[in-house]
């Protein structure tokens, strides 16, 4: 099994909120006002203390699932047995090419998907979608834009399952339950930004 500890993670990138240790790579943490490097035993999941807040339970669950997924994947593929960070995507931030590659890497995508499977098995997700009358899926405009009423449904569904909005969207995409639509359809019809007709 994995050991879970909470620390004040003090890496240079503030979006690093969790770390699965391989027993070799040091992690910057803040203890007693001092920034130090610590090598945690292999199989230790280090979570940032911010995730202990009550309003962070969905993020905490997804992040634990994400790090657990890295552990499962590493057992199947020893080449991936490296210290792994869970980075939160910040839409307000400008990322370097290197940071983008790290965020969108195959191993991170695998861990996100596996975490969403742990938290939202298909049969549970189907029941929740039926409850919210969207069992055939929901339209998504462009990369990730939802009509306000669909966004509200997604938030209610995420709350019902104890997951974040982002985790639910990842799972729905994986299962092909988001129906892609051109963003211009939303802009012209729903927001009525298409000008006079």
Predicted regions and their residues:
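Active-site hotspot residues in diverse enzymes, especially metal/ion-binding acidic/histidine motifs
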Residues: 1-197
């Amino acid at each position: 099994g994995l050991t879970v500890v909470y620390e004040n993670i003090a890496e240079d990138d503030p979006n690093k909120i969790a770390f699965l240790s391989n027993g070799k790579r040091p992690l910057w943490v803040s203890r007693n006002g001092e920034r130090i490097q610590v090598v945690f035993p292999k199989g230790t999941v280090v979570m940032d203390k911010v995730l202990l807040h009550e309003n962070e339970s969905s993020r905490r669950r997804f992040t634990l699932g994400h790090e657990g997924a890295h552990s499962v994947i590493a057992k199947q593929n020893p080449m991936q047995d490296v210290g792994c960070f869970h980075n939160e995507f910040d839409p307000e931030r400008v990322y370097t090419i290197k940071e983008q590659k790290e965020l969108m890497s195959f191993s991170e995508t695998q861990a996100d998907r596996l975490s969403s499977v742990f938290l939202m098995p298909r049969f549970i997700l189907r029941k929740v979608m039926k409850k919210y009358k969207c069992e055939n899926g929901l339209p998504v405009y462009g990369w990730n834009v939802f009509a306000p009423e669909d966004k509200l449904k997604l938030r209610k569904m995420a709350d019902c399952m104890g997951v974040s909005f982002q985790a639910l969207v990842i799972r729905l995409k994986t299962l092909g339950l988001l129906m892609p639509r051109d963003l211009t359809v939303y802009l012209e019809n729903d927001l009525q930004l298409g000008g006079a007709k």
